[in-house]
């Protein structure tokens, strides 16, 4: 991308947009952070060439996956790009690749390990690249929730549906209890399937995707949904509330999409007459209701590809992707702006930078396996069961 082609979005920086880097541990997940002493300097002018050389040396032994929310400096080295589930499936379709370098976050690398063969090794360039939403539901908390459902006498009626953006432990719990996984693209089908299996759904960890899908796609009311807070006894709900609910939503959210507000939508409509507002279903219900279009990252990309020249769009999703789309479609006369006025990067996605990628590729090229993500066999078996149920959805 040349400087002349680059489109700058009108956003203001905020100190809350990016977490401080270089901690010894992720404060939420307590995952260790590997900061090797030989990590290249970000100012090294040869970083791009070093990454290219190491990748060339590895050849078909390495397959680099790049999530849509990654930095441009990283995404340029991805063999494929996409959302988390697409990337995991792409990895499984490349059995000749000994190393899968996942430029994404921890739960994505876990999913890739679950779906790839035992001979393949999944690597995450920075072990602290977690997901705050995935970390909002731990195995212990979900087990306590199931106990509350059992005490309310409804556990046998409940089918768990877990978002792809969850840990391997939560996917395994879901598989063990007869549930399925969903993505933002197939959440409607997953919920329809779940309600064919039982009378109620426990949806975790993203309350907004669960609520939006139930209300927009299945015709439920907000009153059909209750919010389970894992930090309160019995989730802060009475047994009667649990028995009356159709959707039991986990109190989790995406820190990026949760920033978009109704005020953001109103403001952009005032600033840009005729703008189309397109948001991700992880946004709050009132934001989704005020938008013109709602869909996954893949949906957003396809919608902009099909949009007519001269159309105007305000996008409510992660800023790296929005910037990339704005630059891509600017030559076609499509005006694309970020929905919010402040920077809204995914802070953990941004931990994967070019120095970490270079260090990873050079280490692998030298025969040193670093930052491997490996799911234990029992967890893998139940998590894979839940994923296979999703793959079998019509």
PLM feature segments, named:
Residues 2-316, 320-394:
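Active-site loop-to-helix "anion-binding N-cap" substructures in soluble metabolic enzymes
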């Amino acid at each position: 991308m040349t400087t002349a082609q680059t489109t700058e979005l009108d956003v203001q920086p905020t100190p809350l947009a990016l977490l401080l880097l270089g901690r010894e541990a992720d404060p939420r997940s307590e995952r260790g952070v590997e900061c090797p002493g030989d990590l290249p300097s970000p100012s090294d002018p040869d970083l791009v060439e070093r990454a290219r050389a190491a990748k060339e040396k590895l050849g078909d032994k390495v397959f680099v996956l790049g999530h849509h929310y990654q930095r441009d400096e990283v995404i340029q080295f991805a063999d494929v790009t996409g959302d988390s589930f697409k990337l995991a499936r792409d990895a499984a379709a490349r059995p000749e690749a000994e190393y899968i370098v996942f430029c994404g976050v921890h739960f994505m690398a876990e999913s890739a390990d679950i779906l790839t063969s035992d001979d393949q090794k999944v690597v995450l360039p920075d072990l602290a690249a977690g997901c705050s939403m995935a970390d909002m539901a731990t195995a212990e908390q979900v087990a306590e929730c199931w106990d509350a459902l059992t005490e309310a006498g409804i556990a046998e009626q409940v089918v768990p549906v877990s978002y792809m953006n969850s840990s391997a432990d939560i996917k395994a719990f879901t598989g063990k209890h007869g549930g399925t996984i969903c993505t933002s693209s197939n959440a409607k089908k997953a919920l329809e399937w779940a309600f064919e299996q039982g009378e109620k759904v426990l949806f975790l960890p993203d309350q907004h995707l669960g609520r939006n899908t139930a209300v927009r796609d299945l015709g439920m009311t907000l009153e059909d949904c209750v919010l389970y807070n894992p930090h309160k006894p019995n989730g802060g709900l009475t047994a009667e509330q649990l028995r009356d609910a159709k959707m039991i939503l986990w109190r989790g959210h995406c820190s990026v999409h949760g920033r978009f507000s109704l005020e953001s939508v109103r403001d952009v409509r005032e600033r840009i007459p005729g703008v189309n507002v397109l948001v991700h279903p992880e946004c709050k219900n009132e934001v989704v209701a005020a938008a013109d279009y709602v869909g996954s990252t893949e949906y957003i990309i396809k919608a902009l590809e099909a949009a007519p020249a001269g159309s105007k769009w305000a996008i409510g999703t992660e800023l790296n992707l929005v910037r990339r789309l704005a630059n891509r479609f600017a030559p076609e006369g499509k005006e694309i702006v970020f929905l919010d006025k402040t920077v809204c990067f995914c802070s953990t996605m941004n931990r994967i930078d070019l120095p970490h990628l270079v260090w990873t590729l050079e280490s692998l090229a030298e025969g040193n396996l670093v930052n491997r993500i490996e799911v234990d066999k029992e967890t893998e078996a139940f998590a894979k069961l839940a994923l296979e149920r999703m793959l079998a959805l019509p």
